[in-house]
Design a protein with these regions (language model features):
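Acyl-donor binding region in acyl/amide transferases
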Residues: 39-111, 218-222
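A conserved beta-strand-loop-helix scaffold within acyl/acetyltransferase catalytic domains
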Residues: 1-22, 26-39, 82-87, 98-222
Length: 222
C-alpha cells in the first residue's frame, strides 16, 4: 500500500483480497489503474499477486476480483509482474489457464521500462567475507581498493536526495536513460523510509560520488 501512495495521483490504487472459508486473508493483489489517452484505462500489479503462487484457487479468486475491477474502470488490460522464477512451469500453466498471456518476446534486458528478468543473490546466513568470496576477483579488488583510497558509505537523509538526484541526472545523460524528477524520489522517501527504503551514498574526500536506493520487500531487497 505504501508503494500505491508513491504512484498517486497519476495512478489510482485498488486492493483485491482472497479469503479462505474462515475469512482469513490468503492472498492479495494491489492494482494501479491509469488512463491512457486514446486507448482507455490500464491496470498494473507490480510484484503481484502476493500469495501461494501454486494455489490455483487463490489465483482464481484474485483474477475474478481483477475482472470485476476491470469492468468498474472499463480497463482494457491487466498486467501483472509476479515474483516468480522464469522457469516455474506450474505457475505458467496456471496463469495461462486463467487467461493470462505470458510475454516472452523481450530480446534484451532493456527492451522494456521494467526489465523482463531480475538477478538475485542469496546472502542468507552468509558473512560479509563469504559474500565477497562469491564475487569475481576483479570486483573484490575494486571494492577493497575503494576502501583503501578512503571511499566511505553513509546512510543519507531526505535532504541528501538532492545530491543523489544530481548524480542520477549526470549518469542518465551520459548513458542515455531517462531519470525521474527529484519530487518522485522525495515521495518515495516520504512513503517508504525507513522501513521499506534507505538512501546510501558513497563519499570520496567529502564529496558524494555515487548512491543507491535499496527497496525492501518481504525478505528481499531490490
Amino acid at each position: 500500500l505504501e508503494w500505491a501512495e508513491v504512484k498517486k495521483p497519476y495512478w489510482t490504487p485498488e486492493v483485491i483480497l482472497a479469503e479462505d472459508d474462515n475469512k482469513n486473508i490468503i492472498g492479495s493483489l494491489c492494482v494501479l489503474i491509469r488512463k491512457i489517452p486514446i486507448f482507455g484505462n490500464i491496470m498494473y500489479a507490480s510484484r503481484g499477486p502476493v500469495c501461494d503462487i501454486h494455489d490455483l484457487g487463490v489465483l482464481e479468486q484474485l483474477t475474478k476480483g481483477a475482472k470485476e475491477l476491470a469492468k468498474k474502470y472499463n480497463a482494457i488490460v491487466l498486467r501483472i509482474e509476479p515474483d516468480v522464477e522464469s522457469d516455474d512451469q506450474e505457475f505458467r500453466k496456471y496463469v495461462t489457464e486463467l487467461g493470462y498471456k505470458i510475454k516472452d518476446d523481450a530480446k534484451d534486458f532493456m527492451d522494456e521500462i521494467q526489465p523482463r528478468y531480475v538477478f538475485r543473490l542469496d546472502i542468507s546466513g552468509k558473512t560479509e567475507e563469504e559474500v565477497m568470496a562469491g564475487f569475481h576477483q576483479k570486483w573484490r579488488y575494486n571494492i577493497r581498493l575503494a576502501g583503501r583510497k578512503g571511499v566511505t558509505v553513509k546512510e543519507g537523509t531526505r535532504e541528501d536526495l538532492k545530491e543523489f538526484h544530481k548524480i542520477m541526472v549526470e549518469t542518465g545523460a551520459r548513458d542515455g536513460f531517462i531519470i525521474r524528477p527529484l519530487e518522485y524520489f522525495e515521495k518515495m522517501y516520504d512513503n517508504l523510509a525507513p522501513e521499506h527504503m534507505k538512501l546510501l551514498l558513497a563519499y570520496y574526500e567529502g564529496k558524494p560520488i555515487s548512491g543507491v536506493i535499496p527497496i525492501f520487500y518481504g525478505n528481499k531487497t531490490w
